[in-house]
């Protein structure tokens, strides 16, 4: 009986509460709807991604086309949270995460002139490379680099030396009769001993026979043609001397 009494009392209390709620709220569906909307029951709660969760710590950097007139500057909003501050520092220290388009670079690059090629006719009077700011700050002197001689200059110098030697040979009487002009065939000079022996033979006989020419050539270490030519020239010289004597007389 005690259990029945307690259950009856519970049901009566529940019914009395429902009777009190009924005049305030017209229907149970309305009560459920208001309760759900108040505490967010069936409303859709989409999960936020990592990018939206940390959107307050850093903002996405947008790339702008570089403006040659004025450099663009980017301002980042950072929060003061401890956990967000860790991400802020890590992202701020990462140089790859920043877009440096349009920002003036800290280091200035200077163009370097190419060095002239060896053998070329052109040569710059100044140094082959532009001085750096550090060199200018240290009062470094700019030295001139001498121009290397080209192949054409070397050829001209060689021609000049050859012409000078030819002029010396032409002015020197002792070497003029030994060396002929470069256009003609080079003569074969005879030694003093050879000339003396040929002169003796010429005094005995102006016209040597063939056998005697071979014998003289063998004794003087000459060829038969050389002995023959020498005798021909010697006869022409003797005739010229005779003509000159007749004119003088």
Curated annotation (Swiss-Prot):
Gene: hoxa9b
Name of this protein: Homeobox protein Hox-A9b
Gene3D superfamilies, sorted: Homeodomain-like
GO MF assignments: DNA-binding transcription factor activity, RNA polymerase II-specific; RNA polymerase II cis-regulatory region sequence-specific DNA binding
Bias type Basic and acidic residues, positions: 154-170
Organism per entry: Takifugu rubripes
InterPro entries: Abd-B_homeobox_TF, HD, HD_metazoa, Homeobox_CS, Homeodomain-like_sf, Hox9_activation_N, HXA9/HXB9/HXC9
Assigned protein family: Belongs to the Abd-B homeobox family.
Gene Ontology terms describing biological process: anterior/posterior pattern specification; DNA-templated transcription; embryonic skeletal system morphogenesis; proximal/distal pattern formation
């Amino acid at each position: 009986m005690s259990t029945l009494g307690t259950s009856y009392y519970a049901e009566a209390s529940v019914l009395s509460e429902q009777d009190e709620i009924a005049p305030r709220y017209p229907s149970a569906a309305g009560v459920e709807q208001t309760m759900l909307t108040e505490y967010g029951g069936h409303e859709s709660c989409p999960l936020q991604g990592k990018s939206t969760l940390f959107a307050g710590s850093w903002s996405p950097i947008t790339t702008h086309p570089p403006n040659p007139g004025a450099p663009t500057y980017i301002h980042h909003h950072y929060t003061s949270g401890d956990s967000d501050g860790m991400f802020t520092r890590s992202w701020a220290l990462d140089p790859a995460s920043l877009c440096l388009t349009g920002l003036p670079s800290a280091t200035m690059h200077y163009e370097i002139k190419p060095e002239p090629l060896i053998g070329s006719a052109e040569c710059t009077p100044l140094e082959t490379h532009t001085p750096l700011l550090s060199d200018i700050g240290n009062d470094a002197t700019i030295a001139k680099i001498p121009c290397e001689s080209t192949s054409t200059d070397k050829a001209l110098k060689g021609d000049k030396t050859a012409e000078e030697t030819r002029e010396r040979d032409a002015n020197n009487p002792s070497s003029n009769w030994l060396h002929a002009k470069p256009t003609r065939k080079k003569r074969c000079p005879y030694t003093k001993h050879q000339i003396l022996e040929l002169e003796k033979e010429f005094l005995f006989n102006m016209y040597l026979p063939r056998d005697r020419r071979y014998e003289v050539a063998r004794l003087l270490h000459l060829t038969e043609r050389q002995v023959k030519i020498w005798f021909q020239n010697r006869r022409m010289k003797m005739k010229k001397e005779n003509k000159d004597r007749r004119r003088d007389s």
